[in-house]
Amino acid sequence: MVSAQVATELGQPIPLDTQHAVSVCFPTWKSVISYVEKDPKVLGCLKSGYPRFWIHPSIQKLRDILIEKYAKENETCFCFPSYRVAKRCREYVRRKCAHRNGKVRILQLATAKPINEEQKTWKRECKIAVVFVDGAYENILKQYWQYTGEIISSRLAEYVLHELFMVEKKSSPAEEKEYIEMRYGRNLNFAFADRAKELIKKRIATKVIDKDEHDEEENYHFLAGNQDEQDFQDTFLDSSLNEANHGEDHDGGISGEVDSQEEPHNGLVSTIPPEPIEMSTIEEEQSVEEDAGRCALRVCPERDVFLFPSGMASIFTAHRLLLQWDSLRLNRSRNGSDVTSSPPNKKTVIFGFPYADTLHVLQEFNETYFLGEGDESSMKELTKILHSGEQILAVFIETPSNPLLKMGNLLELKRLSELFGFFIIIDETVGGIVNIDGLPFADIVCSSLTKTFSGDSNVIGGSMVLNPQSRVYEFASRFMQLEDEYEDLLWCEDAIYLERNSRDFIARTIRINYSTEYLLDKILKPHVGENKLFKKIYYPNLTSKETLTNYDMVRCKKEGGYGGLFSLTFHDEDHAAAFYDNLKLNKGPSLGTNFTLAFPYTLMTYYHELDMAEKFGVERNLLRISVGLESQSILGKIFQEAIDKTVEI
């Protein structure tokens, strides 16, 4: 296995030379601190970033054009993938600006539909909605974008830029097709997107990849276009909007203004280079074996699996679903666009120390108990709450948690849920569907497809799986069929990339499991101790005996391992910084990538809440490692070299 190119300069995209990369290089410990302290020099270096935190240049260009054309004085905007999402954002802004004179406007845009079968191969109707607010409230829009994950992707933004602001009114279909071919090569087939989504859902539902899925006639290729035409160009042309944009909302937001439906006159030529996807060389027989003990519960891909533009969007939707369930219990009708929560909703529970934005989104939209230890003590605390007579709506839990790799007792949670009537929502992103099978213990399972499922770190997406045996299943199924509540907003090009990337996700997961255990056992564990470099290793079979027992209860029988994510802590920050700086690896946010990725998780995520994080064992000097597909010998040498250089200081 050839190791991936390593980004070494601050702000470089990870992977290198990838227009839609979802990580960014922070080569030194100091660069991370400078970033969270908002050093302008560091911020100005960033050429990439995680999509919910960093605005991709294509999205920013789209925003700039929309602000120039449609914004009123001092207004700014954010783009969302549908009108209904924009309305939910508007409700969020209204709630945040309840005592201020906030004004919110929504502009709807749509690209033209394909008019025949041939055009369907390179043309797609795309509707977006733009939320305009006073610039003073821009951070509120950013919060909604970040917390809920209901975002537009950079590929979608590229397509909208071209279709709405580049194509001349009299441009021919042949000229539009030529643009698509320039971006992707002649064989990219937009019509394959629906089939791609079917395959993605099937893989999530069955945890099996069939060789027969890859019919050669359905394949597509990513061929390089004219490199002289790959850079962004600032050419403005006359263009027109799809006349089918009809204003659905006439209440006009806080200010009482009608949502805008103006026609733009200028546009931007914007192209991206192709991104070849290299397949793993692992034997496919590992990937396609039927009934490998991965699934204890069968689900229907089309009926029970749903796709989203991000993993956070799936968690947010699961939360909205349960709030709607609770509102019916109270005989209150909640409008689908109203994502706020007010008493007497039952409270939700976060069990364990979760990914930061999971905590944020639940606390923003409902009252929440935060049981951050995620162990037996938290279970006792939850039991105490339940025995007090208070009714709980749901428990959200990561399996295992990020970044401490703790595993709660799902069997005990399941027993309590049946006894006291709350629901269980599992985020399976870190463990992965090959390693653990949490669905029998959950009502809903959410996951980020951006991570191990994709692996290539060049596309973002999420999924939700409903447990057909859950008592909320019938309600959830109806909820997910309502257009006001759920829309398939995964852009067609992103679906195509996700399908292609995930064709070997099972084999990749197995390989990463083995490499991680090798790295821990042979290289890192000998250096853990009171007078040694590392203070502690957090990994499902090392965090604690309790975590190991709980993890093994739900580990897939045959091929399930402990995953590719672990965290290291140090006795002091000097050694933590030196070790990080000496690692000759890609260093940036995200996890589950095909290449090994290191990152000072606590510094980046909780720099301004360090006391809170450390209260739950998430130390300032924690370094999170996501193991990739490099050979064990290469990984061993890289980590050993960093250890040797660090102990010398």
Swiss-Prot record:
N6-(pyridoxal phosphate)lysine: residues carrying this PTM: 451
SUPFAM superfamilies: PLP-dependent transferases
InterPro entries in alphabetical order: Cys/Met-Metab_PyrdxlP-dep_enz (IPR000277), PyrdxlP-dep_Trfase (IPR015424), PyrdxlP-dep_Trfase_major (IPR015421), PyrdxlP-dep_Trfase_small (IPR015422), Trans-sulfuration_enzymes (IPR051750)
Pfam families: Cys_Met_Meta_PP
GO biological process: methionine biosynthetic process; transsulfuration
Source taxon at top rank: Eukaryota
Region (Disordered): 242-273
One MF term in the entry's GO annotations: pyridoxal phosphate binding
GO cellular component: cytoplasm; nucleus
Enzyme class: transferase
Keyword Phosphoprotein belongs to the record: yes
Additional observations: Present with 2810 molecules/cell in log phase SD medium.
Physiological role: Catalyzes the formation of L-cystathionine from O-succinyl-L-homoserine (OSHS) and L-cysteine, via a gamma-replacement reaction. In the absence of thiol, catalyzes gamma-elimination to form 2-oxobutanoate, succinate and ammonia.
Protein name: Putative cystathionine gamma-synthase YML082W
Taxonomic path: Eukaryota, Fungi, Dikarya, Ascomycota, Saccharomycotina
